[in-house]
Amino acid sequence: MNGPIIMTREERMKIVHEIKERILDKYGDDVKAIGVYGSLGRQTDGPYSDIEMMCVMSTEEAEFSHEWTTGEWKVEVNFDSEEILLDYASQVESDWPLTHGQFFSILPIYDSGGYLEKVYQTAKSVEAQTFHDAICALIVEELFEYAGKWRNIRVQGPTTFLPSLTVQVAMAGAMLIGLHHRICYTTSASVLTEAVKQSDLPSGYDHLCQFVMSGQLSDSEKLLESLENFWNGIQEWTERHGYIVDVSKRIPF
């Protein structure tokens, strides 16, 4: 296995159409639509990019996938019923800016009834309150927890974990910003560079990202100071935008 190897877009698309024909031969009328997503769907694939496809099925509760490599290239094909796919497209979790970009750049390969457009419209039409709730949950479930971790490191170590924790905090901050602006990042590799270009960032976020993007993660004191500044910036930013985190003085159940 010596891959992935360099391939052209034309070579990838030839494979896509071979897979499409195999899907139609195997599942026949059960197939409603087939599309390509990811960099290939956006037409921004690089020489080593993989192939990602989605298949909308008429079978209720269909939900399975195939992922394989030939040793030279890799493919993932997800099979979902229309109901399951639409439900997932309407969900907003903390990683929505990374997971749901697929629904905004689907390249249709086979679509007998406009199903992929329906998926796109569903993802596009999520209510503002859903994003609001996801932001509040991210602050509590991820960022608040990370703050406890870096404060523990300041008190008792180990500082060896601080560089990777700083990367995690920067990524969580990017998810916060993506949810606020309701944008999906192009790729996981471009998350931070795209996040810092957005308007209305929490104070301290850009400075924190500079450490991560430059790889300057060896000075523990500077990292801890930057993390605290970002956390303070989040407090002011959330209050300004009305993201009220529920605080319970008692056990809530």
Swiss-Prot record:
Keywords: Antibiotic resistance, ATP-binding, Nucleotide-binding, Plasmid, Transferase. Neomycin B binds at residues 52, 67. It catalyses: amikacin + ATP = 4'-adenylylamikacin + diphosphate; kanamycin A + ATP = 4'-adenylylkanamycin A + diphosphate; neomycin B + ATP = 4'-adenylylneomycin B + diphosphate; paromomycin + ATP = 4'-adenylylparomomycin + diphosphate. GO terms for biological process: response to antibiotic. Coiled coil: none annotated. Residues 1-127 are annotated as: N-terminal domain. Residues 128-241 are annotated as: C-terminal domain. Mg(2+) A binds at residues 50, 52, 145. Its EC number is 2.7.7.-. One of its GO terms (molecular function) is nucleotidyltransferase activity. The active site is at 145 (proton acceptor). It comes from the Bacteria. Its cofactor is Mg(2+). Although some of the cross-references in are mapped to other bacteria, they are probably all derived from the gene originally encoded on plasmid pUB110 in S.aureus. Inactivates aminoglycoside antibiotics such as kanamycin by catalyzing the transfer of a nucleotidyl group from a wide variety of nucleoside triphosphates ((d)ATP, (d)CTP, (d)GTP, ITP, TTP and (d)UTP) to the 4'-hydroxyl group of the aminoglycoside. In vitro, antibiotics without the 4'-hydroxyl but possessing a 4''-hydroxyl group (e.g. sisomicin and gentamicin) are also modifed but with poor specificity. The 3' position of the NTP ribose ring does not tolerate large substitutions (e.g. ddATP) and dNTPs and TTP are better substrates than their NTP counterparts. Bilobed; the N-terminus has a 5-strand beta-pleated sheet while the C-terminus is a helical bundle. NCBIfam families: ANT_4p_I, ANT_4p_Ia. This is Aminoglycoside nucleotidyltransferase (4'). It comes from Staphylococcus aureus.
